[in-house]
Design a protein with these regions (language model features):
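Terminal amphipathic alpha-helical/low-complexity segments used for targeting or macromolecular assembly
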Residues: 1-105, 166, 171, 177-178, ...
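Short N-terminal secondary-structure initiator segments
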Residues: 1-20, 130, 136, 237-256, ...
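Residue-level recognition of short, solvent-exposed, well-ordered loop/turn junctions
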Residues: 36, 151, 204-206
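Right-handed parallel beta-helix
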Residues: 99-165, 169
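Glycine-rich hexapeptide-repeat left-handed beta-helix
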Residues: 158-331
């Protein structure tokens, strides 16, 4: 991939930082240990990585003022190097830019609006009464059912399925193979037979939401499933019907959230955590990876950890038997 030369002076301005030397140029972004003498890198402050900072071959390192003495190369001082990294990743993203067009193989239903500023790739199917905003990009194989709305500047990657009546806000990104608006898991037991409950709600997604590959967000039974502004969802996440995920919550991969649970604003949910249904999780809660949440959390800003350490199988059996004996004593 061809690299573009970037001015350190201009980068420092974009990062709201101060460069150690003017007139330098860099051609790429890389980690401290892999950077070459034409690259820029960053040091987020983790002392475990100090040897990488000391020995890096990078031309320029973005770091905090406190870490200057460990750096043997030129640098840009900023308040938050990791946030600066997010800006650098945008500057050095050299992937091919999209030219607006609608490919011939696209199928568009009745009364659907596709602006000329949008990019609609091969074999996309768009249903009836669909409203697509300006500068939207939709990649091959996407299926959009009737009465869907997609806001400006959103990106829908390959093979995503968006079910009827779903609303997606502006500046959202939905990655490959995600499914939005499938039926929630609702059944009523009639004697010995499970009878399906039709899911009559939909899914409403706010602005600046990211949804990872192979994630599923179920439509509500009656009310809508809601994903508010700024939520970031990793790959293979399951969100059940009627859930509300509040603003700026971030959810790591393989998390399962059962139906009708409300997650507060600014929560952090670690990978493979399990959250049972009909719960309320207070804002700014952190849930550690692998933790099962079985009751509501009412304290703001706390961290909850509930995973059990693993053992060799023979030791696990001993621990299990010990716990059983303890239980008999308590009962």
């Amino acid at each position: 991939m061809q690299k573009n030369k970037q001015s350190i002076d201009e980068i420092a301005i974009l990062l709201n930082g101060k460069a150690s030397k003017k007139g330098l140029f860099v051609c790429g972004l890389n980690s401290l240990d892999l950077a070459e003498d034409s690259d820029i890198s960053f040091f987020a402050g983790n002392k475990k990585n100090l040897p990488q900072l000391v020995n890096t071959k990078a031309a320029v390192v973005v770091l905090k003022k406190d870490d200057i003495n460990f750096c043997k190369t030129d640098y840009i001082v900023v308040d938050d190097p990791y946030f600066a990294f997010s800006k650098l990743s945008n500057i050095f993203d050299n992937r091919k830019k999209i030219i607006p067009c609608t490919k011939e193989s696209v199928k568009i239903g009745i009364n659907s609006n596709v602006p000329k500023s949008s990019f609609i790739d091969d074999f996309v199917v768009i249903g009836d009464n669909v409203k697509i905003g300006e500068n939207v990009s939709i990649y091959p194989g996407v299926k959009i059912e009737n009465d869907v709305e997609i806001g400006d500047n959103s990106v829908i990657h390959q093979n995503v399925v968006i079910k009827e009546n779903t609303r997606i806000g502006q500046n959202c990104t939905i990655f490959a193979n995600a499914t939005i608006g499938t039926d929630g898991f609702g059944y009523a037991l009639d004697k010995n037979q499970w009878v399906k409950i039709n899911q009559l709600g939909s899914v409403v997604i706010g602005n600046f939401v990211d949804i990872g590959s192979n994630s599923t967000i179920d439509r509500g039974a009656l009310q809508n499933t809601i994903i508010e502004d700024g939520v970031k969802i990793d790959n293979q996440v399951q969100i059940g019907h009627n859930c509300i995920i509040s603003k700026n919550t971030i959810i790591a991969g393989c998390v399962g959230i059962a139906g009708s649970t409300i997650i507060g604003e600014g929560c952090k949910i670690g990978g493979a955590a399990m959250i049972l249904g009909h719960l309320n999780i207070e804002s700014e809660t952190t849930i550690s990876p692998g933790t099962m949440i079985a009751s509501s959390i009412n304290k703001k800003g706390e961290t909850y950890t509930g995973f059990f350490p693993f053992f060799e199988k023979k030791d696990w059996i001993k621990v299990t038997m010990f716990l059983k004996r303890l239980l008999r004593k308590w009962v």
